[in-house]
Amino acid sequence: MNKSTLPDQFPERYRPLARLLLQAGEENRVYEGNSLEIITSGLRKRELLLEDIRRAKSFIHMEYYRFGNDRAGREVRDLLLQKAAEGVEVRLLNNNLSYWLSIPSKYYRDMTRKGVEVIPFTHIRHGLGTWLYRINHQLHRKVVVIDGQVAYTGGMNLNDNYFYKWRDTHLRITGPIVEGLNASFMQSWKDSGGRFCYPPEHYAPVPVAQEAPLRDKLMQLVSDSPEKPSSAMLEVYQWILDHARDYVYIQTPYFVPPQSLLDSLAGAVKRGVDVRLMLPHKVDTPFMGTTNRAYYQDCLKAGVRILERGGEFIHSKTLVADDEVSVVGASNLDWRSFFLNYEINTLIYDRETTVNGKEIFLSDTMQTQEVKNGSWCRFMRLFYRML
């Protein structure tokens, strides 16, 4: 299938959305014939990821916003070192601030000395000395590709919070979309000054033997970067809200929406769509709880239902709509994800996946309280934009 064409079975209703994303960049391709597992437990991701790493024969590509020097990070690190000793190519692209500030440099030097290539995301096209650019524009993607056969992406970084403490959503994927995720990694690696041992075809996807009925998911990558004139992910949220008929349920840990997104939320409710936002009651980042709530009043006045989830911190970034389309990704509903960071998300055009996602959302609702009062400090909007 041509990169810019849509498969015959693509749902007519969502063709304008898919084409809109393709116009934004050919990396936002549609892939047919995929299979996936929705992961909502860090322990489940740990189990699957470690097993897939153990099976690796050719290469392991990882890019993370956070790769911890803790129980989770060291467990994965030790296995990566083992695979490197076996001759597997192992590459880790880490967000620059995490690389420089969060972990002692010896941690990464030891990995590199023992065969794991580790470099910070620097985006060399803007110059290695552009300190401000590197600080302000972060690699927020969470991607693993193993042997071109299996990939992971979503909201989970790699440290103890994500494996053992928080509630998050991630995907394990097989099928043609793995090629797109690997291409994204390879471009970021090269942009950061990294090299490859072999020509690109060596890292091409390898077919996976699997029953045909399991590989029926239509998926589209949605990639964002500060170099683009507009945010593809913001377009996705607004398009779905503007065209929804029944419901749109959204989970995000951070909520600092531009006015255009607030307008789309309000417009959907005005048409009779059931719009719900789920956010954490307690946020992991100072001031962000208050900043989130600075937007509640506008949403509540429009009729959007806001649910704050107690218990463990919910870091999930998902959308489900009309039992037809869903999103799982790394992007928050905030200015930084839309306009400043390097992000990647998956758009899934599939009824079974969306219904499953809706059931997960409703299950999470059991630990929420609905917000009725939105009279919070609006000045926090200005504070956030200064960060």
Language model features with spans:
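Charged, low-complexity intrinsically disordered terminal segments
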Residues: 1-387
